[in-house]
C-alpha cells in the first residue's frame, strides 16, 4: 500500500457510494458500491484475502470514490460506471447474449421475420427462442400454416411461395385490415399454446384430402400436425398461469458465483442463461450488480414478472429492473426459484470438477516434460519470440506459464534497441541479456525452463547469454516449426538434439500452446509499434500537435486512414483546435501526394 492510498483511506466518509480502483496507468480496474465507503474500501487493504482478491489489490495504486444519498442510488451509479468503463475485474456478461425473436412487422402487408433486436412500436414480438435453429424451425412451421407475405418489396406478380400456399401474394390477396387482424390473432393463439383449433382444422383438411385421393396434400397436413406436436413436447411447462417471467437463482462457493436464469414464456421454459464469474464483495451485492447489467442490455426482453431469491432486497431490484419483482414465499413459485438455485449449484460444481481435471492434466504434463528433459519440474516457463518485417520496428515478447497456465501479469514486451536491420540472433541476444541480467541483479524469480522460438542457432545464442555471459544455470530449449508453421520439434541437451515427444501427449499440447501464445503476443505488439510509428511519422512536426494530442488521436482513430476519413468536426470533438485539425488534414494530403508522385 503506497502513501497516497494510506492518506486517502483516512479521508473516506461513513456514507454510501461507489469506489473506483485504478492501476499504475490510471486505468479503472474495478468498480464497487458500498453502504459504508470507509469500511468497504479499507477492507481491501487490511487482513488476508483469497488469491483473486490479492491479485486485484496488488494492482491498485490509487482509488476514487463518489458519495451517494442512498444504497439504491449507489447501485444505479455502479451499474452505469461498469458499463462505461468496463473494468477488467468486474462481472462481464457473455458476448452476443441476444436471443432470437419472431416478429410480425407492422407493414400494410405484414411479414413474419426473425430478429435479435427489439424496437418499440415496430411490430409484434414473440420469444425469445433459445437459438436461431429453434426460431427458424418455428418460423418454417408458421410459414406453412399462415400465409404471410414473404417478399420484402412490392412486386407485380405472384411469387414461388404463393404457389406453395405459403404467401398471400399481396397483389391479389386481401387488403382488408380485418383479415390481417384475424391472421395475427391466430398466430398469437398458436404461439401461446392455444393450438387445438388449428390442429382440428388441419386434421379436417387431412381427412378431406384423403377422401379426395389427394394423398400428397394429406401427407403435408399430417406433417404439419406432427410438427406442432413436436414443438409442444420441446417446451417444458413450468407454471399453469401461462405468464411470461424470468426466474433467477444463484450459488456461491470458493470465491465464485454462478447465476442461473430461466426464461419462461407463456408458462413454458424456453431457455436458460448461465453465467459464472469471481466475486469480490458481498454475494448479494454482486448479484444485484449482475441483474442491473443483465437488464441494461437492450436486447434482453423484460418480462411481466421477475422471480428472485429470498436473500435479495426487492426494493433494490425494483429500482433497477422496470417490472414486477416477486420474492416467492411458498408453493410452486418458490420451488421454481429453488430449481434455478439448484441448477446454479450444479453448474458451479461442474466448473470446479473440470478445473480440477484440467489441473491434474496440466500438472501431469509439466511433470512429464521435466522427466523427459531430465530437469526439475518446470513450474515456471518463460518463452521468447522476435517479430519484425525486414528489420523494421523490431520487437520481441516474453510470455510466462506458471503451473502450465499463462500468467499474463508476468508477460513482457521489448523494443529492440541495439540491432540494425533484420538480425534475429542479435535481437534474441539483446532481449535475453536485458531480461536475465535484471533477474540476476534484482533477485527476481527465475524460470525453471527458458524456451526460444527457433532452431539450433537461436538456442545456441540463448545458451551463450544465459550460461557464459550471465553465469546462470537455467535450462534452455528451442521449439522449431515445420513448413506449415506448426510446432514440430523440441530441441534440448548438450549437444542439442531433437527430443522425442508423442504428438498426442499433454506435454506436446502444452508446448504448442506456449509457442502459439508467444507468437501471438509478439506479432500483436509488433503491429501496435508499427502502427504507432507510422502514425507518429505522419503527424510529426505539426505545430500545436504534441505527444498528448497524438496519443489521443491514436487511441480514438487507431490509424491514419481513419483520420483521413474523419470530418473536421469529428476530430475537433476530441478537443483539438480547428487550426491544428486543418494542419493535420493538410499533412495527410501532402503525404498521399508524395507517395503517388513519380
Curated annotation (Swiss-Prot):
Q: Which InterPro entries match?
A: GIY-YIG_endonuc, GIY-YIG_endonuc_sf, GIY-YIG_UvrC_Cho, RuvA_2-like, UVR_dom, UVR_dom_sf, UvrABC_protein_C, UvrC
Span of domain UVR: 196-231
Q: What is its main location?
A: cytoplasm
Q: Which residues form the GIY-YIG domain?
A: 14-91
Query: What GO cellular component is one of the record's annotations?
Result: excinuclease repair complex
State if DNA damage is listed as a keyword: yes
Q: Which SMART domains match?
A: GIYc
Where does the record place it? Cytoplasm
One Gene Ontology term from the biological process aspect of the record: nucleotide-excision repair
Q: Which UniProt keywords apply?
A: Cytoplasm, DNA damage, DNA excision, DNA repair, Excision nuclease, SOS response
Which Pfam family would be a valid example here? UVR
Molecular function terms from GO: DNA binding; excinuclease ABC activity
Q: Which NCBIfam families match?
A: uvrC
The record describes the protein's role as: The UvrABC repair system catalyzes the recognition and processing of DNA lesions. UvrC both incises the 5' and 3' sides of the lesion. The N-terminal half is responsible for the 3' incision and the C-terminal half is responsible for the 5' incision.
The entry describes its oligomerization and partners as: Interacts with UvrB in an incision complex.
Q: Which family does it belong to?
A: Belongs to the UvrC family.
Its recorded name reads UvrABC system protein C
Organism listed in the record: Streptococcus pyogenes serotype M6 (strain ATCC BAA-946 / MGAS10394)
The lineage, from the top, is:
Bacteria, Bacillati, Bacillota, Bacilli, Lactobacillales
Source gene? Answer: uvrC
Amino acid at each position: 500500500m503506497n502513501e497516497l492510498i494510506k492518506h486517502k483511506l483516512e479521508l473516506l466518509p461513513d456514507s454510501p457510494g461507489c469506489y473506483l480502483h485504478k492501476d499504475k496507468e490510471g486505468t479503472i480496474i474495478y468498480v464497487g458500491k458500498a453502504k459504508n465507503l470507509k469500511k468497504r474500501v479499507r477492507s481491501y487493504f487490511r487482513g488476508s484475502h483469497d488469491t483473486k482478491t490479492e491479485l486485484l489489490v496488488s494492482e491498485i495504486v490509487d482509488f476514487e470514490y463518489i458519495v451517494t444519498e442512498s444504497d439504491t442510488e449507489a447501485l444505479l451509479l455502479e451499474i452505469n460506471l461498469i458499463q462505461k468503463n468496463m473494468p477488467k475485474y468486474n462481472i462481464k456478461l457473455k458476448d452476443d447474449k441476444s436471443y432470437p425473436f419472431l416478429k410480425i412487422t407492422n407493414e400494410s402487408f405484414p411479414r413474419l421475420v426473425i430478429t435479435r433486436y427489439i424496437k418499440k412500436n415496430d411490430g409484434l414480438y414473440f420469444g425469445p427462442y433459445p437459438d436461431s435453429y429453434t426460431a427458424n424451425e418455428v418460423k418454417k412451421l408458421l410459414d406453412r400454416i399462415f400465409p404471410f407475405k414473404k417478399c420484402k418489396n412490392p412486386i407485380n406478380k405472384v411469387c414461388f411461395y404463393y404457389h406453395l400456399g405459403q404467401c398471400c401474394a399481396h397483389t391479389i390477396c386481401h387488403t382488408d385490415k380485418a383479415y390481417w387482424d384475424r391472421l395475427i390473432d391466430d398466430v398469437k393463439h398458436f404461439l401461446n399454446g392455444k393450438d387445438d383449433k388449428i390442429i382440428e382444422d388441419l386434421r379436417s383438411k387431412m381427412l378431406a384430402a384423403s377422401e379426395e385421393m389427394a394423398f400428397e396434400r394429406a401427407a403435408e397436413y399430417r406433417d404439419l400436425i406432427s410438427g406442432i406436436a413436436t414443438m409442444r413436447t420441446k417446451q417444458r411447462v413450468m407454471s399453469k398461469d401461462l405468464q411470461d417471467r424470468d426466474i433467477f437463482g444463484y450459488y456461491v462457493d470458493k470465491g465464485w458465483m454462478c447465476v442461473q436464469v430461466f426464461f419462461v414464456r407463456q408458462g413454458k421454459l424456453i431457455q436458460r442463461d448461465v453465467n459464472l464469474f469471481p466475486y469480490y464483495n458481498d454475494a448479494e451485492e454482486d448479484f444485484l450488480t449482475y441483474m442491473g447489467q443483465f437488464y441494461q442490455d437492450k436486447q434482453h426482453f423484460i418480462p411481466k414478472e421477475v422471480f428472485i431469491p429470498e436473500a435479495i432486497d426487492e426494493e433494490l431490484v425494483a429500482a433497477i429492473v422496470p417490472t414486477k419483482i416477486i420474492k416467492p414465499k411458498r408453493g410452486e413459485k418458490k420451488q421454481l426459484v429453488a430449481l434455478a438455485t439448484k441448477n446454479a449449484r450444479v453448474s458451479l460444481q461442474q466448473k470446479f470438477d473440470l478445473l480440477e481435471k484440467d489441473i491434474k492434466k496440466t500438472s501431469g504434463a509439466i511433470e512429464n516434460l521435466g522427466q523427459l528433459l531430465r530437469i526439475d519440474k518446470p513450474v515456471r516457463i518463460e518463452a521468447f519470440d522476435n517479430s519484425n518485417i525486414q528489420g523494421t520496428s523490431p520487437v520481441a515478447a516474453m510470455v510466462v506459464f506458471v503451473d502450465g497456465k499463462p500468467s499474463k501479469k508476468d508477460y513482457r514486451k521489448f523494443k529492440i534497441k541495439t540491432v540494425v536491420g533484420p538480425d534475429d540472433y542479435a535481437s534474441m541476444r539483446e532481449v535475453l541479456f536485458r531480461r536475465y541480467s535484471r533477474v540476476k541483479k534484482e533477485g527476481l524469480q527465475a524460470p525453471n525452463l527458458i524456451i526460444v522460438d527457433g532452431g539450433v542457432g537461436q538456442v545456441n545464442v540463448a545458451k551463450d547469454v544465459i550460461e557464459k555471459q550471465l553465469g546462470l544455470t537455467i535450462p534452455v530449449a528451442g521449439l522449431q516449426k515445420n513448413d506449415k508453421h506448426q510446432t514440430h520439434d523440441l530441441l534440448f541437451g548438450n549437444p542439442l538434439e531433437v527430443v522425442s515427444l508423442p504428438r498426442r501427449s499433454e506435454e506436446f499440447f502444452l508446448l504448442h500452446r506456449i509457442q502459439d501464445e508467444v507468437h501471438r503476443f509478439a506479432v500483436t505488439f509488433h503491429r501496435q509499434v508499427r502502427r504507432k510509428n507510422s502514425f507518429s511519422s505522419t503527424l510529426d512536426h505539426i505545430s500545436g500537435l504534441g505527444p498528448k494530442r497524438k496519443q489521443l488521436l491514436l487511441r480514438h482513430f487507431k490509424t491514419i486512414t481513419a483520420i483521413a476519413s474523419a470530418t473536421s468536426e469529428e476530430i475537433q470533438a476530441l478537443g483539438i483546435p480547428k487550426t491544428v485539425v486543418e494542419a493535420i488534414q493538410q499533412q495527410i494530403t501532402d503525404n498521399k501526394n508524395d507517395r503517388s508522385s513519380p
